[in-house]
Amino acid sequence: MAAAMVPGRSESWERGEPGRPALYFCGSIRGGREDRTLYERIVSRLRRFGTVLTEHVAAAELGARGEEAAGGDRLIHEQDLEWLQQADVVVAEVTQPSLGVGYELGRAVAFNKRILCLFRPQSGRVLSAMIRGAADGSRFQVWDYEEGEVEALLDRYFEADPPGQVAASPDPTT
């Protein structure tokens, strides 16, 4: 079965809208699609806070084999890195293990991006120490959650520190 061309991944790499934060969502594709409907909910909520550059991750048409692109895997890699560089915030659902998501997170750290990782402990899985151990409580955060509270958690994260705004310093002289 061939992989499908997915809506949301266009020829143009410029996806952001002027004046709106660019958000990069990471979720498992080739690592497993069990959480796809949850990804739809996350992407839908993220749209309230900015332009989701990678909304195709939640597409029903996208199966575990991924997608077809004219340039193959290399084009997908280059395009996703371009979007990652454009992003103001990276949000990753990390419950379903995925080499690709781990790679994206490593690159996001190297690009000094704000990162929020969401993990569901009730899944029975254990989150990699390389993800949980990277959390610094500021630029890189890992939040454990239950599926029913994902929208409220995203609201809390983005309303507390909206993208594009400088966080207030605890020291008023700085």
Curated annotation (Swiss-Prot):
- Key words of the record: Acetylation, Cytoplasm, Glycosidase, Hydrolase, Nucleotide metabolism, Nucleus, Phosphoprotein
Q: What domain of life is recorded for the organism?
A: Eukaryota
Function recorded in the entry: Part of a nucleotide salvage pathway that eliminates epigenetically modified 5-hydroxymethyl-dCMP (hmdCMP) in a two-step process entailing deamination to cytotoxic 5-hydroxymethyl-dUMP (hmdUMP), followed by its hydrolysis into 5-hydroxymethyluracil (hmU) and 2-deoxy-D-ribose 5-phosphate (deoxyribosephosphate). Catalyzes the second step in that pathway, the hydrolysis of the N-glycosidic bond in hmdUMP, degrading this cytotoxic nucleotide to avoid its genomic integration.
InterPro entries the UniProt entry points to = 2'-dNMP_N-hydrolase, DNPH1, Nucleoside_deoxyribTrfase
Q: Does the keyword Cytoplasm apply?
A: yes
Give a GO molecular function annotation for the protein: protein homodimerization activity
Question: Which residues are annotated as modified residue Phosphoserine in the UniProt record?
Answer: 28, 98, 123, 128, 138, 169
What is this enzyme's EC? Answer: 3.2.2.-
> How is this protein's activity kept under control?
Inhibited by AMP and GMP.
Q: Describe how expression is induced or repressed.
A: Expression is induced by ETV1.
- Can you say where in the cell this protein is located? Cytoplasm; Nucleus
For this chain, the family text in UniProt reads: Belongs to the 2'-deoxynucleoside 5'-phosphate N-hydrolase 1 family.
One Gene Ontology term of the biological-process aspect is: allantoin metabolic process
**Entry annotated with the keyword Cytoplasm:** yes
Tell me the organism's taxonomic lineage.
Answer: Eukaryota, Metazoa, Chordata, Craniata, Vertebrata
* Catalyzed reactions per annotation: 5-hydroxymethyl-dUMP + H2O = 5-hydroxymethyluracil + 2-deoxy-D-ribose 5-phosphate
Residue numbers bearing the N-acetylalanine modification: 2
**Designated name of the protein:** 5-hydroxymethyl-dUMP N-hydrolase
> Which residues participate in 5-hydroxymethyl-dUMP binding?
27, 29-31, 98, 100, 104, 128
GO-annotated cellular components:
cytoplasm; cytosol; extracellular exosome; nucleus
